[in-house]
Swiss-Prot record:
<dbReference type="GO" id="GO:0003735">
    <property type="term" value="F:structural constituent of ribosome"/>
</dbReference>
<dbReference type="GO" id="GO:0005840">
    <property type="term" value="C:ribosome"/>
</dbReference>
<dbReference type="InterPro" id="IPR036791">
    <property type="entry name" value="Ribosomal_bL9_C_sf"/>
</dbReference>
<dbReference type="InterPro" id="IPR009027">
    <property type="entry name" value="Ribosomal_bL9/RNase_H1_N"/>
</dbReference>
<dbReference type="GO" id="GO:1990904">
    <property type="term" value="C:ribonucleoprotein complex"/>
</dbReference>
<dbReference type="InterPro" id="IPR020070">
    <property type="entry name" value="Ribosomal_bL9_N"/>
</dbReference>
<keyword id="KW-0694">RNA-binding</keyword>
<keyword id="KW-0699">rRNA-binding</keyword>
<dbReference type="GO" id="GO:0006412">
    <property type="term" value="P:translation"/>
</dbReference>
<dbReference type="Pfam" id="PF01281">
    <property type="entry name" value="Ribosomal_L9_N"/>
</dbReference>
<dbReference type="InterPro" id="IPR020069">
    <property type="entry name" value="Ribosomal_bL9_C"/>
</dbReference>
<dbReference type="Pfam" id="PF03948">
    <property type="entry name" value="Ribosomal_L9_C"/>
</dbReference>
<keyword id="KW-0689">Ribosomal protein</keyword>
<comment type="function">
    <text>Binds to the 23S rRNA.</text>
</comment>
<comment type="similarity">
    <text>Belongs to the bacterial ribosomal protein bL9 family.</text>
</comment>
<dbReference type="InterPro" id="IPR000244">
    <property type="entry name" value="Ribosomal_bL9"/>
</dbReference>
<protein>
    <recommendedName>
        <fullName>Large ribosomal subunit protein bL9</fullName>
    </recommendedName>
</protein>
């Protein structure tokens, strides 16, 4: 089945890509969730126009992403305050939205929680951590933050 992606799909492609997928994957997952549309000649022409406009925007976005990266890497004193037990273990874990709020509170830019890549092992103890923030397809920044007891 030939589809045009309307959103970025991990391990498949980015919005605007024309992809060939198995019928069941397209019919049962991509189409119902609005992640893709069926590829027709009219849709392909429309996507070409959208891609041209997107390329112009991407150049501006790339410059903005570089500025945000510089801000994030110069940022210090990012701390997430959470409730902990007497032994220093957290009640729950630190989520991407907690990190985004801490960056904003420390004077950094607004971050989308989906762009923050937390470590595979969840943050469940106090201490210093690093996370990657994907700002653009080509640019990622590293943010250092500390989890402290509230």
């Amino acid at each position: 089945m030939k589809l045009i992606l309307t959103a970025d799909v991990e391990n498949l492609g980015v919005a605007g890509d024309i992809v060939e997928v198995k019928d069941g994957y397209g019919r049962n997952l991509l189409l119902p969730r609005g992640l893709a549309i069926v590829a027709t000649r009219g849709a392909e022409k429309q996507i070409e126009g959208i891609k041209r406009a997107q390329e112009a925007r991407e150049i501006r976005d790339l410059d903005h992403a570089r500025e945000v990266k510089a801000q994030l890497e110069a940022l210090e004193g990012v701390s997430v305050a959470v409730r902990t037990s007497e032994k220093g273990k957290l009640f729950g874990s630190v989520k991407a939205e907690d990190v985004a709020a801490a960056v904003k509170k420390a004077g950094g830019p607004n971050l989308d929680k989906r762009s923050i890549e937390l470590p595979k092992s969840l943050v469940k103890a106090t201490g210093a951590y690093k996370v990657n923030v994907k700002l653009h397809s080509d640019i990622a920044a590293t943010v250092n933050f500390e989890v402290v007891a509230a």
